[in-house]
Amino acid sequence: AHGIEVCVEMAQQGGVGLVIYNRKEGRALGEVTKFLVYNARKRQYGGDRAETYFERTECVAGVQDMRFQELMPDVFHWLGVTRIDRWASMSNMKHGALTAAGIAVVERVAIPDELIPADARVEMDAKTAAGYFTPMAPPSAAELALAKGRELHA
């Protein structure tokens, strides 16, 4: 929803807001694997923690991520986009794919902290520690080690 809000703001300011959705649910491993990973994260020793976020996916699926971001900029090229003034994605992989394809990104826009649910903190902390864009400092190793996710029977 935040990305759509950014698009609306750009259009209201006389620019263009563009939403491009690439279906890659659960790091392109699919919905079933995504839910198996969620279940494994809650059941692991020590609970759901950011420090083991990517490891759980690898234990369940054999890989951490199956997305191939290098193809993602093709849609922008087809539409004639050469510059993005406000990029509403925190993904370092998507940003890297865009810039490697010659598309300039002027400003990166993070999801505002107040829009991140408490039970999504594990995912966001793991991703920012792994290189996702954040205007703040990424979490420390000590912060990543804390159990922060929902309990199995909560």
Language model features with spans:
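Catalytic domains of riboflavin
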Residues: 1-154
